[in-house]
A protein has these predicted regions:
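Catalytic cores of nucleotide-sugar-dependent glycosyltransferases that transfer UDP/GDP/TDP-activated
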Residues: 1-173
Length: 173
C-alpha cells in the first residue's frame, strides 16, 4: 500500500531530541600506589593445612585487583608441588645471623608470579626440607624464628619497602 501524503498544515512538528552530554568522570586522587607485604607460613595452592592458607591466597589477590602492589613471602617447603617449584625464578641469596652465636644462615629467594601477586619463597634446606610445614615445637620455633627474620631481610635485599607488613600468625611474628 502507498502512504498518503499529509498536508503541511496538518503535520505535527517533530521535536529534536535533546543532546545529552555526560560530565566527565573524575577519578579521586588516591596518592601513590600502596604496597603490602604478606608474610605467612602457608598459602594455597602451594601449601595449605588450614584457614591461614585460604586467607594468604584470597586477601593478596583481592588487594592486587584494587591496584595495590602486593608481595607474599612464604617458606619454600619441599612439599610444594613440583609444577610450582619448576616455575620459580631465582632472585638472589645472602647470609644472615639468627642470633648472637655468630653462625651465618643461607637465605635464598625464589619468585613466582600469578594474578598480579608476587610470591617470594625463602629457601633454606636446613629449615624447610622436611615433608610437612609443621613438625613439632622443638623444631618449629627455630625454623620460624629464622623465617620471620629472613623475610624482613629479604625485603631489604630486594630493595622493596612496603607501606604495610602484614605478619600472619606466630610463625611470621
Amino acid at each position: 500500500t502507498a502512504l498518503a501524503a499529509v498536508p503541511a498544515e496538518k503535520a505535527v512538528p517533530v521535536k529534536q531530541a535533546a543532546v545529552v552530554t555526560e560530565a566527565p568522570v573524575v577519578q579521586p586522587d588516591l596518592g601513590p600506589r600502596r604496597s603490602v607485604a604478606f608474610i605467612g607460613s602457608e598459602c594455597y595452592p602451594f601449601v595449605k593445612t588450614g584457614g591461614l592458607g585460604d586467607v594468604m591466597y584470597a586477601l593478596p589477590k583481592a588487594l592486587a585487583k584494587l591496584n595495590l602492589d602486593v608481595k607474599v613471602i612464604l617458606p619454600r617447603y619441599k612439599c610444594i608441588p613440583q609444577k610450582f617449584q619448576e616455575k620459580m625464578e631465582y632472585r638472589g641469596s645472602f647470609y644472615m645471623n639468627l642470633c648472637s652465636d655468630g653462625k651465618q644462615y643461607y637465605v635464598g629467594i625464589m619468585e613466582y608470579q600469578e594474578d598480579g601477586v608476587v610470591y617470594d619463597f625463602i629457601d633454606n634446606d636446613e629449615f624447610f626440607s622436611w615433608g610437612n610445614p609443621y613438625t613439632n615445637l622443638i623444631d618449629d620455633i627455630p625454623k620460624f624464628c629464622y623465617f620471620a627474620k629472613a623475610s624482613l631481610a629479604a625485603l631489604n635485599y630486594l630493595d622493596w619497602t612496603p607501606d604495610v607488613v602484614h605478619c600472619h600468625d606466630w610463625q611470621a611474628a
